[in-house]
């Protein structure tokens, strides 16, 4: 038996800097419950580091939204800050 289910509602592929790979972004919709309580989480395949001396990557401040459009806006806002230093997201 599963605890929850999410449906992928949008996927994006970003070309960033000179990486030999592309950064992927995904928006999902948590199913179940009533429509007024729907949650739209988003995630990315990689996180960026502000600079080489940074102790770790810069994580998104907010990854849950109340609408698909808000989740997409948060994803794009995070991607605009991307630098040339990336670390894989182990949970993507």
Task: Enumerate the predicted regions with their spans.
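Negatively charged, low-complexity tracts enriched in Asp/Glu with abundant Ser/Thr
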Residues: 1-24
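Short amphipathic alpha-helical "recognition" segments used for binding
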Residues: 7-11, 15, 33, 72-76
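A structural detector for beta-sheet-dominated domains
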Residues: 17, 28-30, 45, 76-77
């Amino acid at each position: 038996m599963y605890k929850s289910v999410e449906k992928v509602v949008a996927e994006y592929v970003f070309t960033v800097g000179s990486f030999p790979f592309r950064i992927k972004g995904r928006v999902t919709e948590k199913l179940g419950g009533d429509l007024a309580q729907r949650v739209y989480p988003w995630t990315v395949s990689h996180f960026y580091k502000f600079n080489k001396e940074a102790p770790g990557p810069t994580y998104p401040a907010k990854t849950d939204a109340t609408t698909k459009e808000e989740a997409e806006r948060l994803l794009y806002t995070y991607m605009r800050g991307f630098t040339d230093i990336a670390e894989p997201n182990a949970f993507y």
